[in-house]
A protein has these predicted regions:
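Domain-level signature for soluble enzymes in the chorismate/prephenate branch of the shikimate pathway
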Residues: 2-113
Length: 113
């Protein structure tokens, strides 16, 4: 008797609100049963795609250039026509007095900006 295993495509999904419409389509859409979702931060999604622990990843555009052999799958994206204020610099002192800035390691795009 032959044993046939069907493996699901592992996909790393950003667990942030701005990616919710894409995540919903993957998790609840017509092909939802085809995927094994992994909920992650944007930087974790990129790392998982780069190290091969997932097959597909919703990654920040800035990460695409550093992942060798990656290809863009056409379709919907997370974008905006206007300012979204996702990166804020907040300080208790004037900007010229700021010597260091703490950044969220979960989003390398925010750090790059």
């Amino acid at each position: 008797m032959l044993e046939c295993r069907v493996t699901k495509t592992k996909i790393s999904i950003v667990r942030y609100l701005n990616a919710a419409p894409l995540a919903w389509g993957i998790l609840e859409g017509q092909q939802s049963g085809d995927f094994q979702p992994v909920m992650s931060t944007p930087s974790e999604c990129a790392d998982q795609l780069a190290n091969g622990s997932v097959d597909i990843g919703l990654i920040p555009s800035i990460e695409f250039q550093r992942i060798k052999g990656s290809k863009i799958i056409g379709g919907p994206v997370v974008s905006s026509r206007h300012r979204v204020r996702s990166v804020l610099l907040i300080s208790n002192k004037p900007l010229w007095e700021v010597k260091t800035v703490a950044c969220d390691s979960g989003s390398r795009t925010s750090v790059a900006l």
